[in-house]
Amino acid sequence: MARARGSPCPPLPPGRMSWPHGALLFLWLFSPPLGAGGGGVAVTSAAGGGSPPATSCPVACSCSNQASRVICTRRDLAEVPASIPVNTRYLNLQENGIQVIRTDTFKHLRHLEILQLSKNLVRKIEVGAFNGLPSLNTLELFDNRLTTVPTQAFEYLSKLRELWLRNNPIESIPSYAFNRVPSLRRLDLGELKRLEYISEAAFEGLVNLRYLNLGMCNLKDIPNLTALVRLEELELSGNRLDLIRPGSFQGLTSLRKLWLMHAQVATIERNAFDDLKSLEELNLSHNNLMSLPHDLFTPLHRLERVHLNHNPWHCNCDVLWLSWWLKETVPSNTTCCARCHAPAGLKGRYIGELDQSHFTCYAPVIVEPPTDLNVTEGMAAELKCRTGTSMTSVNWLTPNGTLMTHGSYRVRISVLHDGTLNFTNVTVQDTGQYTCMVTNSAGNTTASATLNVSAVDPVAAGGTGSGGGGPGGSGGVGGGSGGYTYFTTVTVETLETQPGEEALQPRGTEKEPPGPTTDGVWGGGRPGDAAGPASSSTTAPAPRSSRPTEKAFTVPITDVTENALKDLDDVMKTTKIIIGCFVAITFMAAVMLVAFYKLRKQHQLHKHHGPTRTVEIINVEDELPAASAVSVAAAAAVASGGGVGGDSHLALPALERDHLNHHHYVAAAFKAHYSSNPSGGGCGGKGPPGLNSIHEPLLFKSGSKENVQETQI
């Protein structure tokens, strides 16, 4: 297209609008200035508000890299600035006076990855304070005044990887305190000096956690860390962990580094580290350790670096295994490791330089050997094997030749930390001889016992079983679950030094005291110490020839049987008393029933006996009124005038009183009297005596013998 004549500018392409020069000048004059920190585009948004985006950096802050980094440190801020650029990725608000983090303070910072609020005066974080931060990766809140873990404030931080809460006056960590942020990989809870309580479920949900700091929290026990299945680094330094127990690190199979410096640890029990299969570095420096259990580090196949310096190690036979382990693991590094503190002759010596020539050691002694056990299939069972010290290691050999150690698990069978072989549910296939092997630096001692498992009798399943809860247990007293036998045979295999072998003993000792012999192990201890192992042996790998001898003797188990028999006698006495009382009550009831029956029989006989009748003559005038008396007299006159029969013409008046109406008895009496009189004849016979006078009427009254004893007519 040709340019028009006199036109100052070339024509615009088709579809483009032409801006007047005045409009462009107006926009240039009134556009807002760029931020002092680098001219990045920013948005203006008040905390918790919804104002439109601003293009400037906050006045109290400095911005760089196109406002993606905002630094507001040491500006005496009491609140979070309102106009933080929307594209900020790094926000530093450390060393200010911020006290409260309010709801939706950062909701417009969707690209924020690192938020530093450390070294403020934050005492409260409102619910929803971190809403709108889907990209937040690191949240630093250390050196503040928080008294509780702001659990609900972490609701929507789906990408949070690091959380720093160290050096806050937090007093307790409740259950599921961090389950809203399962993405956490690093959690710093160090220097919580007012911490008093950690819930058993405090760390539930942190399945991705790799690093945990609980140092300098005044902990007296290691909290439950089972849920941290992916934990790799654990800091426990600066606490007061006097004792490390077995199971303290249960479930931490991925842990690679464990720091326990300055933790006041004095004792580490046998099998305490058995769960740490992946451990590579262990720091136990600056503690109060004097010795370690035999083969403590043996299960730690990946352990490469161990720090044992600055501990008051007591160098004796218990540290020989450690000397051998150090020679194999860190042969050249002697600066990191233990040096003897006692005895005085070995003070300052590196433990890795010690050997058997410096000590006189003996094989371990089994204080509580296993006993033969008779149980029924399906029951739980235990075979105990305890020593007098925790500096030894305990293993078990099963009937099929499998070696069982603490930590090895066969579904139903396990070795507990005290050396006990535990069966949760025995089967008939478990029957056999089990051997306990106790080992220290000088040798090992074994003791065996037989486990007899009987099948369940379907007929007597509900009754007493072999070794069960009844008195008929096989080979047991009282049939308890222990199934103790009355007598058992102990076979002890010992080592006896041959003549002339004393010359091979180390210098500085005239004669080596004897090792564990039959009298020393079994006879010299408590009476119950020899109660029942089927066999026991002691071996010591010393540089001298030895001849094994066997001694067998029978040991009565008196303490167990006497107690069981005493309990059985008490039960029998109680049973006899109950039976006697029942028999006496039954006898008394029978006697009372017989007596009652006899009394009732006599009463029935009395009732069936007919009553004796009597006749009583009473004066009618006393009983009847005048009208009735006249009627009686007239009737008497008619009778005396001659009737056919005296009994048929004697009409007695109806009496008003029922108890005087006895005319039937009167008629019968008259008939009997005149029939027996020969001079009476026909109808003109004489009347009865006393009836000749109408003025003396008589009436016969009958009554029971019970009421009338004697009557005269």
From Swiss-Prot:
Domain notes: The last 4 C-terminal residues bind to the first 2 PDZ domains of DLG4.
Record's GO cellular component terms: cerebellar mossy fiber; glutamatergic synapse; plasma membrane; postsynaptic density membrane; presynaptic membrane
Protein name, UniProt field: Leucine-rich repeat-containing protein 4B
Residues exposed to the Extracellular side: 36-576
Subcellular location: Membrane; Presynaptic cell membrane
Gene name, Swiss-Prot/TrEMBL: LRRC4B
Protein's UniProt keywords contain Signal: yes
Stored PROSITE patterns: IG_LIKE, LRR
Physiological role: Synaptic adhesion protein. Regulates the formation of excitatory synapses. The trans-synaptic adhesion between LRRC4B and PTPRF regulates the formation of excitatory synapses in a bidirectional manner.
Ranges of residues in domain Ig-like C2-type: 364-452
Region listing for Disordered, in residue ranges: 497-551, 694-713
Signal peptide: 1-35
LRR repeat start and end residues: 87-108, 111-132, 135-156, 159-180, 183-205, 208-229, 230-251, 254-275, 278-299
Short name of one Pfam family: LRR_1
Disulfide bridge partners, by residue number: C385-C436
Keywords noted in UniProt: Cell membrane, Cell projection, Disulfide bond, Glycoprotein, Immunoglobulin domain, Leucine-rich repeat, Membrane, Phosphoprotein, Repeat, Signal, Synapse, Transmembrane, Transmembrane helix
Alphabetized Gene3D superfamilies for the sequence: Immunoglobulins, Ribonuclease Inhibitor
Organism: Homo sapiens
Cytoplasmic side: 598-713
Residues carrying sugar: N224, N283, N333, N374, N400, N422, N425, N444, N452
